[in-house]
Design a protein with these regions (language model features):
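Metallocofactor- and cofactor-centric catalytic cores in central/energy metabolism, strongly enriched
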Residues: 2-107
C-alpha cells in the first residue's frame, strides 16, 4: 500500500522567467490555435499596457498559481513595475504563500 512519503517526493519549483527567453516562443504562438494564440494575444496586450504610461495594469490572481510554481513570476512582475495593483483571492496570499513562508513545500 502506498504511503504519504511515496507521493511527497517531487517538490514544486518556482520558475525564474528571467532565465529563459520566451519571446520567440510566444511570438510563434500567434500562428497557432486556441490557448497558444490567446497567450500570444495576451502578451501583446500586456506589452502595450506596460508601454502606455497612462494605463493602469491590474493583475488578477485566482487558483493555485503559487503552489503551481508561479510565485516568482508574480514577484518579478511586481519588482519590475509591470503591475500597478493586484486583486487576489485569499487562498493565494494566505494559504499558498504563507505556508511556503513557514517552510512548507508544495508537491
Amino acid at each position: 500500500m502506498s504511503e504519504k512519503k511515496d507521493f511527497l517526493k517531487e517538490v514544486v519549483k518556482h520558475i525564474d522567467i528571467k532565465q529563459h527567453n520566451v519571446v520567440p516562443l510566444v511570438d510563434a504562438m500567434a500562428d497557432m490555435a486556441f490557448t497558444a494564440r490567446d497567450l500570444n494575444r495576451a502578451a501583446n496586450i500586456l506589452d502595450t499596457m506596460i508601454k502606455d504610461k497612462d494605463c493602469a495594469v491590474i493583475l488578477t490572481l485566482a487558483g493555485s498559481l503559487f503552489s503551481a510554481g508561479l510565485k516568482k513570476v508574480v514577484y518579478d512582475m511586481i519588482m519590475n513595475n509591470m503591475v500597478d495593483a493586484i486583486v487576489s483571492t485569499g487562498a493565494i496570499m494566505v494559504d499558498q504563500d504563507f505556508f511556503e513562508a513557514l517552510g512548507f513545500k508544495h508537491y
